Curated annotation (Swiss-Prot):
E.C. no: 4.3.2.1
Domain of life: Bacteria
Native source species: Bacillus thuringiensis (strain Al Hakam)
Lineage: Bacteria, Bacillati, Bacillota, Bacilli, Bacillales
Pathway stated in the Swiss-Prot or TrEMBL entry: Amino-acid biosynthesis; L-arginine biosynthesis; L-arginine from L-ornithine and carbamoyl phosphate: step 3/3
Family: Belongs to the lyase 1 family. Argininosuccinate lyase subfamily.
InterPro entries: Arg_succ_lyase_C (IPR029419), Argininosuccinate_lyase (IPR009049), Fumarase/histidase_N (IPR024083), Fumarate_lyase_CS (IPR020557), Fumarate_lyase_fam (IPR000362), Fumarate_lyase_N (IPR022761), L-Aspartase-like (IPR008948)
UniProt name for this protein: Argininosuccinate lyase
Catalytic activity: 2-(N(omega)-L-arginino)succinate = fumarate + L-arginine
Gene Ontology biological-process entries: arginine biosynthetic process via ornithine; L-arginine biosynthetic process
Pfam families attached to this UniProt entry: ASL_C2, Lyase_1
Residue spans crossing the bilayer: none
Compartments it resides in: Cytoplasm
Any Gene Ontology CC annotation: cytosol
Gene this chain is encoded by: argH
């Protein structure tokens, strides 16, 4: 077939060259955005008198027809037409005649594809924000049910201090809240229009870029035509934000995997989110959590891939930028899928409160409570730390725990120890007493839950 840009060429490319250069196999995902962008463009052309109202109406009718066909997956794309833009233009001309060729007046594929991706990410980021809020809602519900569920808090994966399970869950709530904030802030840079920037230098036609942007629901335009067609920082920002979100999900999944093991038994995954072994009949594997952890790497890869593509490109457009889409599409699909799976997995898991409680009954996670006890009686904390360290050493040598040490032994270490010491050794009491702002104390958790509910708003109770 003849190319829409083929006027200056005398030889046709080999079929394998066409296939190598074509992007229609993946950029057809932009079909709705491409057609909607074209409708806005031709509407602006008519307003400015660049095409007649009759021509614009005929073009819009043709585009609306193609849009409906696209929604029903009835469009047939060809490699020969290279990309989504030329495929749609070719179909339009076939549908309404040569007047369809006027659609591209005052526009280049360079600003057209950038516009498509802005519109695509606008829709997808808003969906990801909603999915993240739904996951946060599940965390709120789990936290409400586990305010007084006591578990070990860890540093270096060693038991450190007793905490509320709700406190642990809410840590991820606030991480996700920052993820939401990052996505919301990125919409300021996504919701601007490159349309009308042309190939790189603008156009001689008296277009109205602000009007086109308004029709597309965007909040403004790029102020520099070179910038508009040659940068992909809005995609990089999306990939970066998504990498941080996936890192948070991956860390949580790592803990879920550990907690569901026989060594911990803190939680049990629902059968819906676990699989078995083809050889070992007893196995219940946390495959969905492992997949989320694994898929985090591919999102990182998409970010670094595009950063590497962009780092050496001179202004303005270069064909290298065709590599900006597949990683973006893959990241959207991966993030949306992981958020959905994560929400279901957390909503249906069973919390083994007894096992969590047992894990802090016979250990040394209450050692800091004793140091704080001495410090509250006026002893410098460093001296208190030294005394408690010796007590822990004494216990490990005797095969006992701090709760088993008689008061006489405590008094040998410091006369500040009294009978009330044993009250602070209780894990429940230790958690309850940590009532500083943002701490694991029950009253602080209740305050945090109220704030969290206010942030997820309409999703609470769903």
């Amino acid at each position: 077939m003849s190319k829409l840009w083929g006027g200056r060429f005398t030889e046709e490319a080999e079929a394998w060259v066409e296939e190598f250069g074509a992007s229609i196999s993946f950029d057809q995902q932009l079909v709705n955005q491409d057609i909607n962008g074209s409708i806005a463009h031709v509407t602006m052309l008519a307003k400015q008198g660049i095409v007649t109202k009759e021509e614009a109406e005929k073009i819009k009718i043709g585009l609306q027809y193609l849009l409906e066909e696209a929604k029903q997956n009835k469009l047939h794309f060809s490699v020969e037409a290279e990309d989504i833009h030329l495929n749609i233009e070719k179909m339009l001309i076939e549908k309404i005649g040569e007047v369809g060729g006027k659609l591209h007046t005052g526009r280049s594929r360079n600003d057209q594809v950038a516009t498509d991706m802005h519109l695509y990410l606008k829709e997808k980021v808003e969906r990801i924000i909603k999915a993240t809020k739904q996951l946060q809602t599940v965390l709120v519900h789990q936290a409400e049910n586990n305010i007084e569920t006591i578990m070990p808090g860890y540093t270096h994966l060693q038991r450190a201090q007793p905490i509320s399970f709700a406190h642990h869950i809410l840590a991820y709530f606030w991480m996700l809240e920052r993820d939401v904030n990052r996505y919301e802030d990125s919409l300021k840079r996504i919701n601007i229009s490159p349309l009308g920037a042309g190939a790189l230098a603008g156009t001689t036609f008296p277009i109205d870029r602000e009007y086109s942007a308004e029709l597309l629901g965007l909040n403004g335009i790029y102020e520099n035509s070179l910038d508009a067609v040659s940068d992909r920082d809005f995609i990089l920002e999306f990939l970066s934000n998504s990498s941080i979100l996936m890192m948070h999900l991956s860390r949580f999944c790592e803990e879920l995997i550990l907690w569901s093991s026989q060594e911990f038994q803190f939680i049990e995954m629902s059968d819906q989110y676990a699989t078995g072994s083809s050889i070992m009949p007893q196995k219940k594997n946390p495959d969905m959590a492992e997949l989320i952890r694994g898929k985090t790497g591919r999102v990182y890869g998409n970010l670094f891939s595009l950063l590497t593509v962009m780092k050496g490109l001179p202004l303005a457009y270069n064909k290298d930028l065709q590599e900006d889409k597949e990683g973006m599409f893959d990241t959207v699909k991966t993030v949306e899928g992981c958020l959905h799976i994560m929400a279901g997995m957390l909503e249906t898991m069973t919390v083994n409160k007894e096992k969590m409680g047992q894990a802090v009954t016979k250990d040394f996670s209450n050692a800091t409570e004793i140091a704080d006890y001495l410090a509250s009686k006026g002893l410098p904390f460093r001296q208190a730390h030294e005394i408690v360290g010796k007590l822990v050493l004494h216990c490990t040598q005797k095969g006992i725990y701090l709760v088993d040490v008689p008061l006489e032994t405590y008094k040998e270490m410091s006369l500040l120890f009294e009978e009330d010491l044993y009250e602070v050794l209780s894990p429940y009491a230790a958690v309850k007493r940590r009532n500083s702002a943002g701490g694991t104390g029950f009253e602080q958790i209740k305050k945090a839950l109220e704030k969290a509910k206010g942030l997820v708003g309409e999703f609470v109770g769903s």
